[in-house]
Structure formats: structure tokens, C-alpha cells
Amino acid sequence: MPSVFSALPGAVLDDSGLLHLGSPLVEQRRLAAGEAIAPLGDRAVIAVPGEDRLSWLDSLTSQALTRLDPGVGTELLVLDPQGHVEHAASVVDDGETAWLITDRGDAEGLLAWLRKMRFRLRVDPRAADDEFAVVGGTRSALARVVPATPAGRPLVWIDPWPDVSPGGYGYAAVDPHPGADRDWAEAIVTRDEERRIADAAAAGDLVLAGLTAVDALRVAAWRPRWTTDVDERALPHELDWMRTAVHLDKGCYRGQETVAKVHNLGHPPRRLVALQLDGSDSVLPVHGAAVRVGDESVGTVTSAALHYEEGPIALAIVRRSVAVDAVLTVDTSDGVISAAQEVVVPPDAGRTANIPRMPRLSRRASAQ
């Protein structure tokens, strides 16, 4: 379906939605300041009504949801039996329905899996994109839109990142966290409200920002995302996603054993790093670009952006063995550029359990 934002002056769109309106850096600044709203055409909405919805989602996912209060935002992961991330979603409940906001590329697979896992429980997950869209911004910015209220409660998800949620665990050891000042929320709106937003922007009554601005602010906050930062091997530990998407003290769910083992007894095999890229040529690496130490490839870029204050930045996943002070380079279309590494997940992440060490008896002593 054609975007309602396509006719706006300067609008640049692709299949994911509105990328920008001609000034991505200005849009970033205004979005961060609470002066702009971003249409999130790359998101999808899944509705999960039914009396058993929260206990059912709790049993299937990494998050504790049974006692989730209406209007409180959290996020969940669906893991495979080996603990790898398969799906991710933001979730807010209105007292009658759990509303999942997902990356559009993940929505079909997540919905199919949820429908397969219903059994005889009182749940009925369905795609809700025909009825609803998603817009994002600071909490104050979203006061300019009218969220959907199907059960009388506004459908607004407030991003918990980077605070460590109950039952979570943060690996990034920096203080303050670069996302500490990030104020981000997403509102589910009706399609009529989406059209009103577009009309208000065309009339100059509302300022919009595109997805390019949204992603740059996300990368600067070290915030992982399914579309860009998850591959078939991704563990939540590697992305510091344990802080908001995993509850370590809840009941059993698929993949929990691996989550607990890596966190308590081992180390994640890879780790997320933030990169400050050489900005002399303003060339950004593409998704999947090689990260190197010397000539050896030690990881890949997952997200890259041109930030309005920090310049060219990126997130990358590298081997755990890469030294925290290693000199890194990144492949680009114009050649190799240097990259200064900032540690997000340290090499010693995990192994949090205090395992008692028993004195070892010699063979002679044990034989006596």
C-alpha cells in the first residue's frame, strides 16, 4: 500500500518507509530534542487477545509477563533450543490484549510461530497492520499524536533501554551508559490518525523525522535491533540484550538452559562493540562489512550511521578473543577505514556464578 507520507516535500522512501525529508542530521537533532515525530513504517503490529495471553507469552519467551501491568512496556525474545535469537518484539498490554511491535521483516515468522503454539489456550494472535501503524519519538513529542485506545488505554510503548529491567543483567560497564539520556517511545495509532499526521506535516503543523534519524540515535545508544544486529548465531548475551529482554529468574522457556549456562558458567563467543569510524571521507560501511585486525577478519558491522554529533559510528559483532585495545579497520566501498573500538560487551562477560573450588586430594592421600 502506498505510504501516506510519499507526497511530502523532500520525502525519500524505500520499502521500509520514510527514510528522510532531505535533512537527516537536522531531523536527528529535532527528534532527540522532542521536536519531531518519526513514522515507523519498518514496524509491524501483532495483537494477542485472550484470557491466557500473558501466561502463554511468558511460557514461550525470555520475558516474565504473567504479572505485566497494563500500560507498562517491556520486550521479549523467542529463542531456539540452543538459545539463539529467532524473534524479538516490544510488548505493551492494555488489559485485554497484548500488543507486540516487531520489525516488519520478523512479523510474519513470529506470527506463524505464535499461531502454531496456541494449542487449546484462550489466545488468538493476529496481524493488525491493516488497522494500525506505529510512530516514534520522545514521550513529550508523542503527546502531539492520538494513540489507539481499543480497550480505553493508550497504546504507547516506552522503551526501557538502557535501564536494567527486573530479572535482567547489564554487561556494558560504562557509566553513564551512552543511552542513558535517550528518551524513546512508540505509539500504535489508527490508520486514520496516521493520515492526520501526514496532513499536519504537509500543512507545517507537525515536524517529522525519517528512519535514518531513528537508526542513528539507536546506534549511538548501543541499542540492538532484530533487523540489523541478529544473525542465526546471535545470543542475547552477545548484544547486551540481557538488560531489557531476558528475565533470569522466571520459569522454563525454550533456550533458557543455554541462557543460564552462558551467563553463569561461560562466556558468549562473540561480543558487541561500538565503533567510532574515520570520518575523513564520510563513507559508511554496509551491513555485514568485515571488521579486521590487520588482514584478519574478526567480525562484521551490523549497523552504521552518520550521527549529528558523533559523526560516523557503527555497531559490530566481533570474536570474544579480540583485544579491547586492538586496532581495528572496516571494509567500505572506497577501501579500508580505521575504527576506534568502544567495549559494549566485555570479553569476560558471563561466568557470574560463584562456583566453590574443593581441595584436590592427591592420589596417595586418597588411597590411604
Describe every region a protein language model picked out.
Residues 187-276:
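Anionic-ligand-binding alpha/beta catalytic cores of soluble enzymes and soluble regulatory domains
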Residues 50, 100, 137, 255, ...:
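Residue-level signal for inorganic ion chemistry
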Residues 240-246, 256, 260-368:
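Glycine-rich, small/acidic residue-mixed loop/short-helix segments
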Residues 47-52, 137-141, 276-285:
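Short, surface-exposed ligand-recognition loops at beta-strand->loop->(often short) alpha-helix junctions
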Residues 1-74, 79, 83-86, 368:
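Acidic, proline/glycine-enriched N-terminal capping motif
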Residues 24-33, 72-88, 118-121, 162-175, ...:
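Short amphipathic beta-strand starts and helix->beta connectors
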Residues 70-73, 152-169, 222, 227, ...:
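Glycine-centered loop/turn motifs
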Residues 36-37, 45, 90-224:
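Acidic, low-complexity central loop/insert segments
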